[in-house]
Amino acid sequence: MMNHPARPAAQLAQLTSLAQPALPAQLARSGGRAILADALQESRARTLALLNVYVASLGEELIVPDSPQLNPPRWEVGHVAWFQDYWIARNRQRERGIAAEPAHDRPSGRLAQADSWFNSSLVPHQNRWDLPLPDFAAPRDYLAASLAETLALLAVTPETDDDLYFYRLALFHEDMHTEAAVYMAQALNIPLPAALLAPARALPENRALQLPAQDWQLGYSGNGFAFDNELGAHPVAVAAGEIDSCVLSWARYLPFLDATGTAPPRYLRRSNDGNGNETGNETGNDVTDGAGWQCLVGGHWQPLNIAAPAIHLSWFEADAWCRWAGRRLPTEAEWEAAALTLPDFQWGEVWEWTASRFHPYPDFSAHPYRDYSAPWFGERYVLRGASRATSPRMAHPRYRNYFTPERNDIHGGFRSCAR
């Protein structure tokens, strides 16, 4: 990555176009100190707002079940504070950007055992429930102290991409954890205030978009921040074909359940007619109302909005619908090309499963946070887009999300392509 100067907001505002990501994502990746300072404080405010919701529901002990899809909330809070502290205040090579040596000697942290408690590279997921973590006040104070020092250092940091790299990384890292906290709240039946999610929007009518044949340059190139798995832009032959203009709605998904007898997805159930008899759609056509279905939101069952995106679907459920409908999932190259070239391609409601396994691009080189991508290549599938729980800063059309195919706790959905 070259050491280019960061761009001021006025210049970035001119970049919004069909071929550019939404402005918040571009600002976060290429903006200067003032933009980053505001973003870091906004992200921390969301972290604290979510923490307050958890405390109100669970108490200050913040005890949750041991599960592969959850993390102990006290560990999460400490980890977010530790990550920012470790990669910024304690990082003697932060001005080197991606050339920094990750294992260099660092000064001691503000919590004596922080490295042994909160370093996710050293603490396996299953061990996090057994750590002798400090009481609730210590991680909260850790959050405040780490942010204060980060902002003080940022104020005197040169405005180049190398110098700002770790500030941007810490920002995106915290945004990822606040999104994970939204997923975990749903899994724990914790209701969230509406302000912590983007407003729900009914999907427009789906249309068949024609994606022309092309050699698509897959991946990120240019100035500003990029995740290591986005780099290595390379041409990929994309065949001409048809792709949905928007993600699948429940109205399109539910007939598959009735036609095949497939069990409903997570957080979805059939309602009944008042006499204990389940109701449903037996016609195989698009569902026109949600009278036969309910969804679980924040611990409460409510009528399903069938115009809303189908959500909390695993890769297997998305693929099964496609096979039933004679369709297929797009590859990540098809998705990226459509998002950046087709004006009517709508995205941002749910993370979208693709047919592509998460593999490195050519000449992949891990960035200093070594465990961000490399350990997960091959076993996961790529999701593209963003969801209502995603910070707008993360909603970049070249961003590669990735999960194991059974995950149905995330805000995952899909769109389809013609075979």
Residue positions per predicted region:
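Short, well-ordered junction/capping motifs at the entry into regular secondary structure
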Residues: 307, 333-347, 377, 401
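Extended, Lys/Arg-enriched charged tracts that mediate electrostatic binding to polyanionic substrates
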Residues: 202-218
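Short, contiguous alpha-helical
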Residues: 2-5, 37, 45, 62-119, ...
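Bulky hydrophobic/aromatic "packing anchor" residues in well-ordered structure
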Residues: 216-218, 243, 310, 318, ...
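Surface-exposed recognition segments
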Residues: 231-234, 260-266, 346-419
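N-terminal regions that are enriched for targeting/export leaders
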Residues: 2-15, 21-62, 66
